[in-house]
A protein has these predicted regions:
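Chalcogenol-based redox active-site neighborhoods
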Residues: 1-178
Length: 178
């Protein structure tokens, strides 16, 4: 389990148009927003990433760098990017499932063809959203076991305004409870 205020696992994945993304070498002014999505087969992911790409300039104005990452192959990630039409959004791919596990993501097995006619990969990671401080520590994290009920990016943007204005600390750091 990832703990707020503690270092996150290293994350290094190729992106489609922005070179390799390595979280430890890509510190933002305030935060890096890492959005793990299921992949091309997920219509909810497409809508979610469209919302993210719409708000990308607002995150950037707040000193937040953004990357969307899946365990999809480069070809499948490119097909998703083609649907998104958001050239400013860094789209990472080929996330090793072992690294997904280190981030606390759930892994699902294929159920075959989806409702949109796209084959699910044999195994893939489920969604997660993380805010990482420039020092590589976790500020915020949310993981889902399925594509539903994810954090809304407009609410996250508004929460960032509060957190930055008030220098609000990461919460959930206490680990001594039994």
């Amino acid at each position: 389990m990832l703990i707020p205020r503690q270092p996150v696992p290293d994350l290094c994945v190729p992106t489609l148009a922005h070179g390799d993304f390595t979280i430890s070498a890509d510190a933002a002014q305030n935060f890096t927003l890492v959005v793990f999505y299921r992949g091309l087969h997920c219509p909810i992911c497409l809508r979610y990433l469209l919302e993210l790409s719409r708000l990308l300039p607002e995150f950037e104005q707040r000193g937040v760098k953004v990357v969307a990452v899946s365990s999809d192959t480069a070809e499948r990630a490119q097909a998703m990017a083609d649907k998104l039409r958001a050239p400013g959004l860094r789209v990472g791919h080929s996330l090793p499932l072992a690294v997904a596990r280190e981030w606390g993501l759930y892994i699902s097995a294929s159920r075959g063809m989806t409702s949109i006619g796209v084959q699910e990969p044999a195994l893939f990671s489920e969604p997660g959203v993380f805010l990482v401080r420039p020092d590589g520590t976790l500020y915020y994290g949310a993981v889902q076991t399925m594509p539903f009920a994810r954090p809304h990016f407009d609410e996250l943007r508004d929460a960032l305004d509060f957190a930055l204005a008030k220098n609000y600390p990461a919460r959930g750091e206490y680990t001594a409870a039994s």
